[in-house]
Amino acid sequence: MSNDELKEDPEVSIIIPTYNRSEMLCSALGSALGQTYTNFECIVVNDGSTDDTDLELAKFSDKRIRILHQDNQGVSSARNFAIRESCGKYIALLDSDDEWLPEKLDLQLSFMKSESLDICQTNETWVRNGKQVKQSKKYRKPSGMFFEQSLETCLISPSCTMFNRKFWDSVGPFDENMPACEDYDLWIRSGFKFPVGLLEDRLTIKHGGRPDQLTNRVASFDLYRIYSIIKLLHSKELGPDELELAKSELQRKVGYFLGGCMKRGKVEQAERVEIVVEAVLNGQSVAPADVLAGQKIFRG
């Protein structure tokens, strides 16, 4: 069977959400189709793109590709849609501006099976504006159970990640109310349940530095991380130790957020968030979404 023929039961489902990134998408999709491991389906969700994404996708004739369309609803919705439509035992996420080395799926799947893992990630190479950059120690990927570290910062990159259905059924889906930090949200929900395997090889290329990236568009990432932690506290799933860690990190993140608001003269915004968080820490019943009420999502 040739590489471009879809087997009846693909073992891996590659998930690529995309919005107005036709040029980068071709590189990402090409790196997926160029894998040495071939028993996969590749689901691309066009999340309401207004550029020539469909024209670029039409250039690919590989039968393993499935193209889905939806109105623009964000990356969380697009990923969830694709995963609902997928049939692989394993799910591999790939952002449309990143790339994989050819052996990524082969080595990662073998590693997951040999170590009996439910989720693992590879190491990655960072490329910013076309040039490779050095990663700071802060973002060095750990392995095992690292819930406390995950609360502080996002240490799992979607494009590096592969997980099985057991993992997804336990902690999914991505929160579609979040235009950003949806990965942070999923990882802190899973961080006290599943150890994360780390394949040391740098098998993923993570691109950055472009103005269209959410990093450059979202008004406040801290706000969405605060929302995520409040949701986690609200879930009642945490044990005593995890509960204290989450509360401590919530207070720290709120401190950063309030300080930023004060510097920018956004006193009313700061007061609204502070009231909600104080209620949460005092054990009062608060809807997590209250912390987002009236908040500006994007800059400009």
Region annotations inferred by a language model:
Residues 1-33:
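N-proximal low-complexity "stem/linker" segments adjacent to membrane-targeting elements
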Residues 2-7, 208-300:
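C-terminal subregions of glycosyltransferases and related glycan-biosynthesis enzymes
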Residues 23-26, 51-59, 99, 103:
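Acidic helix N-cap motif at the loop->helix transition within catalytic regions
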Residues 31, 38, 46-55, 73, ...:
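A conserved acidic beta->alpha catalytic loop
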Residues 70-86:
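Glycine-rich, basic loop-to-helix element that forms the pyrophosphate-binding segment
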Residues 84, 140-228:
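Conserved nucleotide-sugar donor-binding catalytic segment
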Residues 91:
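Short aromatic/hydrophobic "clamp" motif used to bind/position activated sugar donors
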Residues 103-134:
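Conserved donor NDP-sugar-binding/catalytic core segment of glycosyltransferases
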